[in-house]
């Protein structure tokens, strides 16, 4: 069972605010605590939808590092990695789900008994309460609060 790092909420708040201050939005943040030193991976995107360049990532690294140092959220050595999400990543934001409607996805969720289930189908929509996918022409509604991940897939493979 995957347990999120206890500092994740504070780190996400800090990274999100720093990203907004510099014209970006936070796409994802992961803490790889098993690495020595610990690694903080931050993915940013432009709210306009424009591509994030390597120069953008490099330029964002300094203010993000400064924000981390000034916040005292982390009190151990760490490596900071800044990148942008690419195709094949997990879908997370409302924008992701709008952009990739009618694309093939894998959905991993927990059934009512707590067992992990995986469904592959075509993304139809995400509502406030459900994710709808088409599996061989049949619509499946999956409760949002049971979803562990939604990832773009290759339709042939």
UniProtKB/Swiss-Prot annotation:
GO terms for cellular component: cytosol. Keywords: Cytoplasm, Ribosome biogenesis. Belongs to the RimP family. It is found in: Cytoplasm. This is Ribosome maturation factor RimP. InterPro entries: Ribosome_maturation_RimP (IPR003728), RimP_N (IPR028989), RimP_N_sf (IPR035956). One of its GO terms (biological process) is ribosomal small subunit assembly. Disulfide bonds: none annotated. Gene3D superfamilies: RimP-like superfamily, N-terminal. Its main location: cytoplasm. Required for maturation of 30S ribosomal subunits.
């Amino acid at each position: 069972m995957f347990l999120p790092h206890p500092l994740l909420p504070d780190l996400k708040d800090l990274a999100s605010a720093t990203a907004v201050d510099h014209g970006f939005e936070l796409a994802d943040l992961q803490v790889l605590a098993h690495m020595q030193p610990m690694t903080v991976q931050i993915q940013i995107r432009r709210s306009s939808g424009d591509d994030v360049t390597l120069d953008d990532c490099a330029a964002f690294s300094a203010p993000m590092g400064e924000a981390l140092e000034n916040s005292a959220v982390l009190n151990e050595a760490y490596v900071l990695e800044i990148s942008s999400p690419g195709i094949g990543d997990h879908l997370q934001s409302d924008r992701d789900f709008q952009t990739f409607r009618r694309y093939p996805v894998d959905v991993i969720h927990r059934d009512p008994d707590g067992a992990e289930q995986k469904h592959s189908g075509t993304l139809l929509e995400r509502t406030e309460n459900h994710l709808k996918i088409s599996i061989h022409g049949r619509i499946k509604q999956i409760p949002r609060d049971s979803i562990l991940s939604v990832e773009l897939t290759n339709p042939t493979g």
